[in-house]
Amino acid sequence: MAAQVTDALKNLKVKDPNSVIESAAEAKSNGNTQAEAEDSDDEEEEPVNGEGAGEGGAKKKRKRKKKPKKKAGANPKVQSSPPRVLLSNLFPSGEYPVGEEVEYRDENNYRTTSEEKRYLDRMNNDFLQEYRQAAEIHRQVRQYAKANIKPGQTLTEIAEGIEDSVRALTGHPGLEEGDNIKGGVAFPTGVNLDHIAAHYSPNAGNKTVLAYENVMKVDFGVHVNGRIVDSAFTIAFDPMYDNLLEAVKQATNTGIKEAGIDARLGEIGEHIQETMESYEVEIKGQTYQVKPIRNLNGHDILQWKIHGGKSVPIVKSNDQTKMEEGEVFAIETFGSTGNGYVRDDLECSHYAKVADAPNVPLRIASAGKLLNVINKNFGTLPFCRRYLDRLGQDKYLLGLNALVSHGIVQDYPPLVDKKGSYTAQFEHTIVLRPNCKEVISRGDDY
């Protein structure tokens, strides 16, 4: 998501809800609730010449069964458009596609062939299958989104279209208590335009329309049992922005290349910075060096917690903290034609309950009621105002602000560089397996 912010900044998508439920239910029941054609047990008799049968003798008959008819409603083999087929129907074995596997380098190269490390890797199968399922959902949803997002659409249409697809493919519409905690949308869909780098998702009534000249960062997450896949890409229709996007994409790939067990976080940031600053982009006749946004970082990911505590800088730093075996990281980079530094601005949409929130008395009744809704529907997963609207909550802003002021809920306002600048983002989730590094969200697109 949702980049982690440093310095003074804080650390840290809906159509008719019924349509989402119907879509998910329809996909989930595909092959189960539709009437199935019965295999025929009728037999036909086929005359054959019997051995030693005399002329005019009776012909022996050989029984031949009809071929069984194909069952109506058999599990689909391909995803629908828009994506609405439950992913487990496409992978009935429960085995999901493996991400990009990258061998460890240097002193960790032995891990590739170590029998002990391969054994430990096999022990993580359930953990990995949940991550791979979430990653495949992310790939299928973004494939459709990238092909269908066009100028003229509202940001609300774009965000809710992505979120509806995620809910359908996970089979978790998120309207029943606890359903979204089992799986579904991991955090609000970010649709960040131009100088807005992160944490912008439309609130109710937002009429902002995507234009041809915009640069939009699309940052969305999928989770299965709290295993969060966090991946982001940037869309630009005008080719003059191509170098900006390429700089950030390659910087992210550099970060992935340098990441690994025992890799020092500060050194990863140095390599990312070198890659990004090697690019220039000409926009409207003016040339800019692409700058890393120095107070935005990648981060580790824990179960049901998008920011675990470790930060992966995108500029050189003295951080000697090492990555460790079994950890999961979001490697994300942001490039800008502006100051290369973001600040809080605009109306807030992103919120999350603080994991170790204080137990304090709440004088505002609506705050206690809202906290109960948050606990039962999101836990520590980030949410936005639209998600509360979708659950039928109203007149909740006073209570929400009270939870924020008491330190129970953290607000995450949009993060912006200077107005008139352009920013880009690319992000992948990686798993540091015992015997290799798996770029779990890697696809053919990025």
Curated annotation (Swiss-Prot):
Subcellular location field: Cytoplasm
GO biological process: proteolysis
Positions annotated to bind a divalent metal cation 2: D230, H299, E332, E427
Molecular function GO terms recorded: aminopeptidase activity; initiator methionyl aminopeptidase activity; metal ion binding; metalloaminopeptidase activity; metalloexopeptidase activity
Protein purpose: Cotranslationally removes the N-terminal methionine from nascent proteins. The N-terminal methionine is often cleaved when the second residue in the primary sequence is small and uncharged (Met-Ala-, Cys, Gly, Pro, Ser, Thr, or Val).
EC code: 3.4.11.18
PANTHER family the UniProt entry points to: METHIONINE AMINOPEPTIDASE 2
Superkingdom of the organism of origin: Eukaryota
Organism: Sclerotinia sclerotiorum (strain ATCC 18683 / 1980 / Ss-1)
Protein name: Methionine aminopeptidase 2
Compositionally skewed regions (Acidic residues) per UniProt: 36-48
Stretches for region Disordered: 1-91
Class of this enzyme: hydrolase
Keyword terms, alphabetized: Aminopeptidase, Cytoplasm, Hydrolase, Metal-binding, Protease
Binding site for a divalent metal cation 1: D219, D230, E427
Basic residues biased stretches: 59-72
